[in-house]
């Protein structure tokens, strides 16, 4: 890991640990989870939010006012709003995506959940997602939350990352394996 990334993840981990522990002590983990999901979605969808958080062009006061307005508009809890205000005052909003991911991981661990990253060639139906989650739950022994993405280059099948293991049943991987086998023979 590069040094700047390591520093960023360290900063994010400190904020994540603090907000998680405060929410846990207050019994507000469900609200925090909802806030983190909303912030993660907003970060992914809004180039303006990413620009606000990462651009050095904005003054500290402008960042603070903007993030407070965003938090109010999104209806975030006071704990999350105050955390964002503190991050803005310290010019630490650039670690927001890492902090969100860290908090989500802490909440999942607290709930006995594990997140599986699933990449499919086509969107999964609710029935397929439920069957996959049940199968992965049997394998992992924990509740499984699916984080799905679509990659049409897989042609068909799935790539599932669960913890440190990866299961690749995609047509793309099978074709690559077949191509390698043919190279060895010929």
UniProtKB/Swiss-Prot annotation:
Q: What is its main location?
A: membrane
- Any idea which UniProt keywords this protein has? ATP synthesis, Cell inner membrane, Cell membrane, CF(1), Hydrogen ion transport, Ion transport, Membrane, Transport
The protein's location, in the record's own words, is: Cell inner membrane
- A single GO molecular function term of this UniProt record: proton-transporting ATP synthase activity, rotational mechanism
Q: Name one GO cellular component term.
A: plasma membrane
Task: Indicate how the chain sits in the lipid bilayer.
Answer: Peripheral membrane protein
Q: Which family does it belong to?
A: Belongs to the ATPase delta chain family.
Q: What does this protein do?
A: F(1)F(0) ATP synthase produces ATP from ADP in the presence of a proton or sodium gradient. F-type ATPases consist of two structural domains, F(1) containing the extramembraneous catalytic core and F(0) containing the membrane proton channel, linked together by a central stalk and a peripheral stalk. During catalysis, ATP synthesis in the catalytic domain of F(1) is coupled via a rotary mechanism of the central stalk subunits to proton translocation. This protein is part of the stalk that links CF(0) to CF(1). It either transmits conformational changes from CF(0) to CF(1) or is implicated in proton conduction.
Quaternary context: F-type ATPases have 2 components, F(1) - the catalytic core - and F(0) - the membrane proton channel. F(1) has five subunits: alpha(3), beta(3), gamma(1), delta(1), epsilon(1). CF(0) has four main subunits: a(1), b(1), b'(1) and c(10-14). The alpha and beta chains form an alternating ring which encloses part of the gamma chain. F(1) is attached to F(0) by a central stalk formed by the gamma and epsilon chains, while a peripheral stalk is formed by the delta, b and b' chains.
Query: What name does the UniProt record give this protein?
Result: ATP synthase subunit delta
Organism, as annotated? Cereibacter sphaeroides (strain ATCC 17025 / ATH 2.4.3)
